[in-house]
Amino acid sequence: KRTNNQDYVNLFVNRAGRTMIILADGMGGHRAGNIASEMAVTDLGVAWVDTQIDTVNEVREWFAHHLEVENQKIYQMGRDEAYKGMGTTLEALAIIDHQAIYAHIGDSRIGLIRGEEYHQLTSDHSLVNELLKAGQLTPEEAEAHPQKNIITQSIGQKDEIQPDFGIVSLEAGDYLVMNSDGLTNMISGSEIYDIVTSDISLDDKAATLVRFANNAGGLDNITVALVSIKEEAAE
């Protein structure tokens, strides 16, 4: 619903034919957030396209190196008055054979739909989630917390980032859902499950998720990437 879109997502294929999807939700005044998210996605994507990487271990090493390079690049830009407060969340997901490997910074999310359930794979790097994990807030209090949008890590911070990495084995019939917090602030995991498993095209599923979140009163940008796992490979 926001007029300026600070979210950005794109898909890239490297020389070994391996796909990576990268999603970012930028922050910062004026256009700083738009620039940060587009820059992080594009810089990482351009670097990925040039690799021959073909194993999850190589992807993990690649993530660890390139995410910090991008963190420093955006941090340096953010020191300029025009880009004050510039930063971005980042979700990057590569699919290698029957495995997905991902890197996570911030409060965008990656989820897996398998069988009857939506599983959130990532844990938000947010103040509210830290308080929740420490037992200082109940899930209900966390939902309605006024500082819900404060994140504890982002690409563009001064300190070295500590990304979360994960690997998930994929099965036919799985869906991977990547989204900015504009979606999950507005609709529940069970609603995401119902829409993604409904009998409509993949594009329509993504569009329906966004529409539902907007109808629920979504005030933020909402960006979604959906991956459907078939018998042979990912679509």
What are these regions, as identified by a protein language model?
Residues 1-235:
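PP2C/PPM-type serine/threonine phosphatase catalytic domain
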